[in-house]
């Protein structure tokens, strides 16, 4: 997904990929995607490297990032997407190998700074290694920021109805850390934990301790939903809340937060470029201090 997104931007050039897959299989997985469809471009393998739209991309299969010699191909930024090197200490091996910056594509397992577009990016101070948080945090944080800035959040609960992920089982199997997580993904709605709400407290410090949440894993291949149920400090009608979100989506958070009043469903957002889209018709309010936002 990172590669496909980069191909749509003229200011990003992919120069190298490190993966334990061989280049032929990598090319196959790039060409064909069951969720996002066929790749719009030419893909071939030459001398063990990928050639995409005529550009050669170095392919390596190193288990230790320290051996990657990023300096040989002029790497500026590494997207660390293995899910393994999620601490400053381990991700710093990329820096030792010649990269200038590292972006972790998931939440860090230590105190590595976490940034969410549209929320706390202005506080970035040139750190070499940062986390881009999780998909759920990127969905939740912009919405929570708007509500907290405009009305104040006293306390809130978040539920994400989350699409199936690669760690789940196709049929029941052992999963010692999470027994329910070991049940068949296509057969069940599976309650699960999520660190997304806690992560929001890191990118919006005012909400630290005011927000927690859980997840339901559901049998869909892509697109997830976040349900934010919040008690507001300043009373506001649901219409006023929607108006504030729409204003932010068309203003300071344009390109990050979206707003829709259409009768949409999850598949309508397959390939969505915005990190969060507020569904005005899906939410409800109990009163002027208690709202559910989707």
UniProtKB/Swiss-Prot annotation:
GO terms for biological process: glucose metabolic process; glycolytic process. It holds the Pfam family Gp_dh_C. Its main location: cytoplasm. Its EC number is 1.2.1.12. The keyword Methyltransferase does not apply. GO terms for molecular function: glyceraldehyde-3-phosphate dehydrogenase (NAD+) (phosphorylating) activity; NAD binding; NADP binding. It catalyses: D-glyceraldehyde 3-phosphate + phosphate + NAD(+) = (2R)-3-phospho-glyceroyl phosphate + NADH + H(+). Pathway: Carbohydrate degradation; glycolysis; pyruvate from D-glyceraldehyde 3-phosphate: step 1/5. It is found in: Cytoplasm. Keywords: Cytoplasm, Glycolysis, NAD, Nucleotide-binding, Oxidoreductase. InterPro entries: GlycerAld/Erythrose_P_DH (IPR020831), GlycerAld_3-P_DH_AS (IPR020830), GlycerAld_3-P_DH_cat (IPR020829), GlycerAld_3-P_DH_NAD(P)-bd (IPR020828), Glyceraldehyde-3-P_DH_1 (IPR006424), NAD(P)-bd_dom_sf (IPR036291). PROSITE patterns: GAPDH. GO terms for cellular component: cytoplasm. The record marks 162 as: Activates thiol group during catalysis. NAD(+) binds at residues 19, 63, 105. The keyword Oxidoreductase applies. D-glyceraldehyde 3-phosphate binds at residues 134-136, 165, 194-195, 217. The active site is at residue 135. Belongs to the glyceraldehyde-3-phosphate dehydrogenase family. Homotetramer. Catalyzes the oxidative phosphorylation of glyceraldehyde 3-phosphate (G3P) to 1,3-bisphosphoglycerate (BPG) using the cofactor NAD. The first reaction step involves the formation of a hemiacetal intermediate between G3P and a cysteine residue, and this hemiacetal intermediate is then oxidized to a thioester, with concomitant reduction of NAD to NADH. The reduced NADH is then exchanged with the second NAD, and the thioester is attacked by a nucleophilic inorganic phosphate to produce BPG. This is Glyceraldehyde-3-phosphate dehydrogenase. The lineage of its organism: Bacteria, Pseudomonadati, Pseudomonadota, Gammaproteobacteria, Enterobacterales.
């Amino acid at each position: 997904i990172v590669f496909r997104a980069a191909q749509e931007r003229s200011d990003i050039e992919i120069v190298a990929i490190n993966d334990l897959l061989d280049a032929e299989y990598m090319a196959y997985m790039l060409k064909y995607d069951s969720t996002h469809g066929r790749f719009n471009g030419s893909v071939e393998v030459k001398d063990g490297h990928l050639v995409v739209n005529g550009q050669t991309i170095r392919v390596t299969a190193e288990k230790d990032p320290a051996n990657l010699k990023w300096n040989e191909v002029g790497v500026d930024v590494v997207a660390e997407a293995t899910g393994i090197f999620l601490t400053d200490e381990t991700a710093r091996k990329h820096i030792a190998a010649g990269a200038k910056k590292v972006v972790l594509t998931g939440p860090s397992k230590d105190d590595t700074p976490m940034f969410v577009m549209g929320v706390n990016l202005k506080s970035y101070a040139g750190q070499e290694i940062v986390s881009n948080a999780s998909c759920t945090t990127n969905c939740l944080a912009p919405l929570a920021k708007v509500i907290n800035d405009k009305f104040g959040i006293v306390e809130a609960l978040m539920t994400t109805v989350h699409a199936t992920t690669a760690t789940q089982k196709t049929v029941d199997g052992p999963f010692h850390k999470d027994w329910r997580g070991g049940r068949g993904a296509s057969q069940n709605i599976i309650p699960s934990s999520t660190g997304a709400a806690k992560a929001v407290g890191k990118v919006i410090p005012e909400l630290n301790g005011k927000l927690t949440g859980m997840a339901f894993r559901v049998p869909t291949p892509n697109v997830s939903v976040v349900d934010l149920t919040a008690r507001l400090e300043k009373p506001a009608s649901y219409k006023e809340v929607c108006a504030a979100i729409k204003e932010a989506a068309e203003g300071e958070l344009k390109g990050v937060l979206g707003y829709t009043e259409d009768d949409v469903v999850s598949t309508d957002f397959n390939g969505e470029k915005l990190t969060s889209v507020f569904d005005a018709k899906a939410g409800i309010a109990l009163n002027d201090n208690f709202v559910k936002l989707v």
